[in-house]
Amino acid sequence: MAEMKKTIDNKPAPKGEKKANRRGAARLAAVQALYQMDVGGAGLNDIFAEFESHWLGNEVEGDQYLPAEQAFFQDVVSGVVRDQAKLDPLIDVALAKGWPLARIDAILRAVMRAGAYELEHRKDVPARVVVSEYVDVANAFVEGEETGMVNAVLDQIARQFRADEFSRG
């Protein structure tokens, strides 16, 4: 018998719910988790436990959080933590001169780190989709020029890691 995909709250995904919606929720959750780790100093295991038991698929402070694809969420968060020393210089190079990653708001650092990780390691997701999804995530937190910066940085990184996708048109 095929194993049913589980959401981040370990409940089966509703039949009408699309994989893309669960992945989008996982991306948003990953960015929130990375932000919390960055500003609050929380550890990976604590973050996983908190998000899996209290946030996703639940109502928190009046907001209903969507179920998320647990494996995808964990992959992005743990991958960014593992590869951050490699990802940060890539993002720094893609940022405009005079704007090192350390000067960028913590939530945008989390967005760009997650996007850069996914571009490098999640070849199952087209690069343009990754960039678009993380621009959408950024839009949940900031407006205007900041989302343009996220788009430009991730597009540059995408062309570095996935040049073949862009050469095909």
From Swiss-Prot:
UniProt entry tagged with the keyword Transcription: yes
Entry's family note: Belongs to the NusB family.
Annotated gene: nusB
Record keywords, A-Z: RNA-binding, Transcription, Transcription antitermination, Transcription regulation
Any Gene Ontology CC annotation: cytosol
InterPro entries, alphabetized: NusB-like_sf (IPR035926), NusB_fam (IPR011605), NusB_RsmB_TIM44 (IPR006027)
Organism annotation: Rhodopseudomonas palustris (strain BisB18)
UniProt cross-references to Gene3D superfamilies, sorted A to Z: NusB-like
Pfam family, one: NusB
Protein name: Transcription antitermination protein NusB
Function noted in UniProt: Involved in transcription antitermination. Required for transcription of ribosomal RNA (rRNA) genes. Binds specifically to the boxA antiterminator sequence of the ribosomal RNA (rrn) operons.
Residue ranges, compositional bias (Basic and acidic residues): 1-19
Cited SUPFAM superfamilies: NusB-like
Chain spans, region Disordered: 1-22
